[in-house]
Design a protein with these regions (language model features):
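Solvent-exposed beta-strand/loop surfaces of large extracellular or lumenal domains
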Residues: 458-483, 500-505
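Catalytic-core region of carbohydrate-active enzymes that cleave or remodel glycosidic bonds
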Residues: 269-289, 305-353
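Structural helix-adjacent loops and short alpha-helical linkers that scaffold large soluble proteins
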Residues: 1-10, 66-82, 142-159, 215-229, ...
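Well-ordered alpha-helical segments within folded domains of soluble proteins
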Residues: 49-68, 78, 126-144, 197-217, ...
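Surface-exposed beta-strand/loop patches in extracellular or lumenal glycoproteins
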Residues: 443-456
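C-terminal beta-rich recognition modules with glycine/proline-rich loops and embedded aromatic residues
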Residues: 17, 280, 334-438, 474, ...
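Carbohydrate-binding/catalytic loop surfaces
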Residues: 29-50, 96-111, 123-131, 174-207, ...
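Low-complexity, Ser/Thr/Pro/Gly-enriched N-terminal "stalk/linker" regions
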Residues: 1-58, 65, 69-102, 107-109, ...
Length: 558
């Protein structure tokens, strides 16, 4: 039997971070490539307007969060992307513009005005409301890591600029379109969109409340809070997007619905708005009920005649929502969080480039470690005309960070082991041996009370401390140990049942083979890049990050 603790989630995150390093145009001041797409049978890299703000914000965030988990230096590439991101902010209105300001007209460290640059050939500058949230994501993590006053000032300037262009009515606000320029808006007003249905994207800019709330938690910024409250009140009370039962029709991530819900929950938790927590829980339950048993999450629900692919960004948002709901006492949400972290999240990554032909060796290095944006339940690149969008690779790093960060928590002298993942902390270290064997080890660092969440699929485990059997108290799904001493080793043992099931997803029936909650095989396999064709030997090879190289606690909290 293979005996190894599982650190594959960190291997995948490190590989993704390296992929992002390669996914930059060094002839264009480290501009990211948004697209890795199969055209005429060949994987090619290409630019899109999403490079400018969305990708540079997400890449910045991803590398910072990767650095929380493991040793990861600030590279030349990260510094270049940061400069590229900052260069997109207007000094006049504080907004981040997608086009015309950076490639030919400025070098690194220069901060141009938002005038169109004909040399870019991409049309007029636009400040996309979705992309403002991704700039905020990167800037907020940057500020939390560094405390840099300049970054704080830039976030304040952006919050002021967004408030200035927002339409206000009573105690809520909204945007008059999807993309703004000094010459006017394009797209549909969010207030009008609520009467037109979900395809008009009434939540497109509302997801700004997630990074704004995290920034507000750290600073209590009045500029951030007024915008948060205005957008939150629009989403929850005025937009009509979310039904009473938590259901909705729309794309989860790209239409802003799911990340906006995470923002609502974070603000509710920070301000004692407890009445909003059940609202967020209903959204979570609705999405989980439309997802697969192994953590495949649909890109959209109730649109486009049924979505049969999933986007990695949706998994990240749902993990975030699940771990924060657990902090509110909804511990049962962690079961599906762990399912996603063990299954669909790692399997959505390209780790075998031999399956593709590439435009160049450089494109191959970009592809290794990239995450898919059109994931079929049984294979990647489910929409061959589209492909591996840069947002998903950066989001996958964020998902790994969220699982790592929330796997262990501490409150009132008690350490809670929320997820059965391998992790180090200042209080104790954990080592998970799934799916190789039913074993979970805890090495105590400090004298603390310990509570271990026991997932529903595990019957009461046998427990030893320093080799001696003990009978800890088990209640409400938690196993509690009161008398652990520094240096003690606690071992939980339990059977890993093997089973086979059938499941219909998107109108197609799949046959599934499991070890515990780890999906080993799915049939029929996908065509272009089959996934879930696992065996224990190949999975052991992914445990290439030694546990003792992981960090014990983050300086950046999400």
């Amino acid at each position: 039997m293979i005996c190894t603790h599982d650190t594959s989630i960190y291997y995948a995150a490190r590989l993704a971070g390296t992929s992002l390093i390669h996914r930059l145009d060094r002839d264009a001041h480290f501009r990211p490539f948004f697209d890795l797409r199969i055209r005429d049978g060949v994987m090619r890299a290409s630019h899109a307007s999403w490079d400018c703000v969305d990708m540079s914000g997400r890449f910045t965030d991803a590398w910072i969060l990767l650095r929380q988990m493991m040793d990861w230096p600030v590279t030349e590439e990260e510094s270049g992307v940061r400069e590229y991101l900052l260069a997109g902010q207007s000094t006049e209105d504080g907004l981040f513009y997608d086009c015309g300001v950076r490639i030919a007209d400025c070098g690194l460290g220069e901060h141009p005005s938002p005038q169109p640059s004909p040399s870019r050939g991409e049309g007029v500058d636009r400040a996309d409301m979705f992309c403002q949230s991704r700039a905020l994501l990167g800037l907020t993590s940057w500020f939390l890591e560094s405390g840099d006053i300049e970054i704080e000032e830039r976030i304040e300037m952006l919050a002021d600029g967004l408030w200035e262009i927002a339409a206000k009515k009573d105690d809520f606000c909204y945007y008059l379109g999807h993309r703004y320029s000094p010459d006017g808006w394009t797209g549909v007003s969010a207030y009008t969109a609520k009467e037109m249905g979900p395809t008009a994207l009434p939540a497109y800019g509302v997801l700004q409340i997630l990074p704004l709330t995290r920034y507000w938690e750290a600073t209590r910024s009045p500029a951030a809070e007024r915008l948060i409250l205005g957008l939150l009140n629009f989403l929850v009370r005025e937009s009509g997007i979310i039904r009473e039962d938590g259901g909705f029709n729309g794309h989860l991530h790209s239409w802003g619905i799911l990340p906006s819900t995470v923002g609502v929950l974070r603000y509710a938790m920070a301000t004692g708005r407890d009445e909003l927590i059940p609202w967020c829980r209903r959204v979570y339950d609705f999405i989980v009920s439309r997802s697969s048993s192994f953590g495949w999450v649909p890109d959209g629900i109730g649109v486009d005649d049924g979505i049969t692919t999933g986007e990695t960004c949706c998994i990240t948002d749902l993990i975030h929502l699940g771990v924060k709901l657990a902090e509110c006492g909804h511990d049962e949400c962690l079961d599906f969080v762990e399912v996603m972290a063990r299954n669909q999240l790692p399997e959505s990554q390209i780790r075998d480039t031999s399956r593709f032909e590439f435009e160049s060796p450089e494109v191959e290095t970009m592809t290794l470690g990239a995450y898919d944006s059109w994931v079929m339940p049984n294979g990647l690149t489910g929409c061959s005309e589209l492909g591996l969008e840069g947002c998903c690779t950066a989001s996958a790093v964020r998902a790994a960070y969220l699982a790592w960060k929330h796997a262990i928590s501490h409150s009132s002298g008690e350490v809670r082991v929320n997820l059965m993942l391998s992790r180090r902390s200042e209080w104790l270290d954990t080592a998970s041996y799934q799916p190789f064997e039913g074993r979970f080890d805890i090495v105590v660092r400090k004298p603390v009370r310990i509570a271990v969440r026991i997932p529903k699929w595990i019957a009461k485990p046998s427990v030893t401390m320093d080799g001696q059997p003990i009978s800890p108290r088990v209640a409400g799904g938690w196993l509690r140990i009161e008398d652990a001493r520094p240096g003690s080793r606690i071992e939980l043992r339990f059977p890993i049942p093997e089973r086979r099931t059938e499941e219909e997803i998107g109108g197609r029936t799949y046959r599934l083979s499991w070890r515990g909650i780890t999906l080993m095989k799915i049939e029929p396999p996908g065509e272009i890049y089959p996934i879930f064709q696992r065996n224990l030997e190949s999975m052991a090879e992914l445990n290439a990050v030694p546990l003792d190289t992981l960090k014990t606690h983050p300086s950046v909290e999400w």
